[in-house]
């Protein structure tokens, strides 16, 4: 993918790791009626870790390797983490992947600084998407009531944070929470 993008665009200087999936489920759940114990499947775990963490890691590796090979400077990687990295019930796999991505933001910033590549992350809270548009109205209202700015985020809110990471050459190794103050 990096080779193709480099060839088609005549070079690269930025990467936004924005792929992500959810496969929600409690790690362990006891059925109230039958007493049966259900466990989060390895497939559910692997799917989320594979896309949200492994995919971003391998793409970052290939991007930075290309920057080093071509002696391109400066460069920047933006990781899309999530405020869920602080822990969400029923999202062990998603939380682990997004927390690891935020941790790797710091690690990679330290590793890649010698190559002129900065790394930052943006951690969205709830954002208007087809998924949130389909939420039960009562649940949606309760969520909005808990957000100090009184609304669900918009894609434009995230873009402003991503744009900041891309453009501010003094920003490195940190994660910006864009959640309307929900996690403060």
Kindly label every feature range from the protein language model:
Residues 60-61, 106:
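A short, exposed helix-loop element centered on a Lys and neighboring polar residues
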Residues 21, 34-44, 69, 73-100, ...:
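Catalytic loop of short-chain dehydrogenase/reductase
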Residues 19-26, 32, 180-181:
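Conserved NAD(P)H cofactor-binding loop of Rossmann-fold oxidoreductase domains
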Residues 113-118, 172-173:
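Short, small/polar-rich loop/turn modules that mediate ligand/substrate recognition or access, typified
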Residues 3-7, 26-50:
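Active-site Tyr-X3-Lys motif and surrounding loop/helix of classical short-chain dehydrogenase/reductase
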Residues 23-24, 123-134:
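Short, flexible catalytic-loop segment of classical short-chain dehydrogenase/reductase
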Residues 9, 151-178, 183:
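C-terminal substrate-recognition "lid" of short-chain dehydrogenase/reductases
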């Amino acid at each position: 993918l990096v080779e193709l993008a480099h060839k088609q665009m005549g070079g690269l200087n930025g990467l936004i790791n924005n792929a992500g999936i959810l496969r929600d489920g409690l790690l362990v759940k006891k059925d109230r009626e039958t007493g049966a114990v259900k466990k989060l499947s390895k497939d559910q775990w692997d799917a989320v870790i594979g896309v949200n963490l492994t995919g971003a890691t391998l793409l970052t590796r290939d991007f930075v390797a290309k920057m080093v090979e071509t002696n391109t400077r400066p460069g920047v990687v933006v990781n899309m983490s999530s405020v869920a990295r602080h822990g969400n019930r029923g999202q062990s796999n998603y939380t682990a992947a997004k927390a690891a991505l935020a941790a790797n933001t710091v690690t990679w910033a330290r590793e890649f600084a010698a190559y002129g590549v900065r790394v930052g992350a943006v951690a969205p809270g709830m954002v208007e998407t087809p998924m949130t548009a389909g939420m039960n109205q009562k649940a949606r209202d309760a969520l909005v009531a808990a957000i100090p700015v009184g609304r669900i985020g918009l894609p434009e809110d995230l873009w402003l944070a991503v744009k900041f990471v891309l453009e501010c050459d003094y920003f490195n190794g940190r994660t910006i929470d864009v959640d309307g103050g929900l996690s403060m």
